[in-house]
C-alpha cells in the first residue's frame, strides 16, 4: 500500500514535469524496484564514487534491493541501517534539477524513521493506511511520531478501502 502510493505520487509528479526521486527506505521489505519494474537493475558509480540512481520513466530510484542478490534477505540493524540510509541521502548523485525526493518508509516508527529525522529534519509526511483497525492503529502512532519529531503531516491517505465495480457501478469494500 505505502509503496504503491509513493510510486503513484512520483509518477504523477513526473507526468507534470516535476523532477522527482524515490528512496526505498523500507530496507527489509523493499518493493519499489518491483513496482517500477527495475528489480534486475544495478546502479553505477561516477568518478567520485557517488551512486548513480536507476532511472525509470524520468524518475530516479534508489533501493537496497539494487545492491543485494535476488531473494536474499537484508539482515541488518542499528548502525548498518543508518549507514545505508545515510548513503541514500549523501552519496547518491541525484540530478541537479531534482525537485523532490519521496521516501518510502517501512511500517512503524523504528530506526529508519529516527535516522531520516536526523538527516532531513524539515521533512513533510503523508501517512498511508488502510481501513483495517490494526493498520489504522499503526498510522495513528506514525502520525504521533511525526509530530513528536517535528515533521509536518501533509495529509492521510486511506488506501484499499473500496473500489467502484465497473459492472454494476456499486461501491465494493476491499
PLM features: residue spans?
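Conserved, well-folded catalytic cores of nucleic-acid-processing
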Residues: 16, 34-39, 65, 87-95, ...
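Switch II (G3) loop of P-loop NTPases
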Residues: 43-45, 64-115
